Every structure is written in structure tokens, then in C-alpha cells.
């Protein structure tokens, strides 16, 4: 059975707007046996909601964004019961 990975992406973070690095990362994780799901944030607080609502069913959450996106992702993960919390990268 594949491991599940949630990619939380803030498309507004960073200076480059290219999606090439994201596609490359998704490909690498897929080849490593992960079933990858990509979700984009649209506004403040979205990463928290995504991590909390979708993270408990995942083995790993990868945060692709800036400090704020990472902070929100961690906040969402910490709302998941300890025994169901995924790793965060």
C-alpha cells in the first residue's frame, strides 16, 4: 500500500512563480512510493485548515511556501490527535 503525502503549497510565496520545482518534487515523492495529493492555499489560515482536516490520513505533509505557510501547517498538525499526527517536512 502506498504511503500518503499531502503537499500544501502557497503559490504566492517566494520570488519565483514557476511550478517546475513543485512538479519535480511530486515526481520524486511518487517514485519513492507516495500517493501525493497537492492542495493550494488561497488565503490566510488555509494551510492550518488543510493540515488539520486532511493531515490525519497522511504519513507525511510537505509544506511548500514561506515562514507563514510553515507556521500555519504546524498549527494545523498540532490540532490532530498525537497518535495520528503525520511527519512534516
PLM regions and their residue ranges:
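Small-residue-rich beta-alpha loop regions that form the catalytic core of phosphotransfer
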Residues: 2-89
Amino acid at each position: 500500500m502506498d504511503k500518503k503525502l499531502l503537499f500544501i503549497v502557497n503559490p504566492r510565496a517566494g520570488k519565483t512563480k514557476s511550478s517546475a520545482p513543485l512538479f519535480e518534487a511530486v515526481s520524486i515523492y511518487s517514485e519513492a512510493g507516495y500517493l501525493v495529493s497537492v492542495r493550494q492555499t488561497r488565503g490566510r489560515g488555509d494551510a492550518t485548515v488543510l493540515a488539520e482536516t486532511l493531515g490525519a490520513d497522511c504519513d507525511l505533509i510537505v509544506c511548500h511556501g514561506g515562514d507563514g505557510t510553515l507556521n500555519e501547517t504546524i498549527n494545523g498538525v498540532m490540532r490532530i490527535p498525537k497518535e495520528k499526527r503525520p511527519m512534516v517536512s
